[in-house]
Amino acid sequence: AGMRVELVGWDVSWQDAVVDDALAAELRALGPVGRYAVDIQRIVREFCRAETKIDGFDLPDPVAMCCAIDETVVARDLHARVDVHLGHGDARGQTVVDHLGVTGRPVNARVVLRADRARFVAMLRDALR
């Protein structure tokens, strides 16, 4: 009630927050924090290679945090109705975004559609120095 709701979905992460091998090497070279941050992603990197076919590893939580901290990271957004499916079965917990306003229900969230990759990477570098 009265709290601003912002959704940064996983799709933003795999579009704009993937760390490929070249960027991973650059981040590791920043020092012990950068090295640690990249090294703990080893299993995620293997999962991404095998399952999601992402060339690197994605960072959903860091990109969401960067969007919350700095408005300039948000490259494209939408104000829409968002609901969470609370029923049973495979869709339980799924977020449903009314992109077209067809439900007629009031807007209740800002949905981030794309992040500014360059700004995100700059913030990531700064945090890992």
Predicted segments, located by residue:
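Conformational coupling and interaction surfaces
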Residues: 4-129
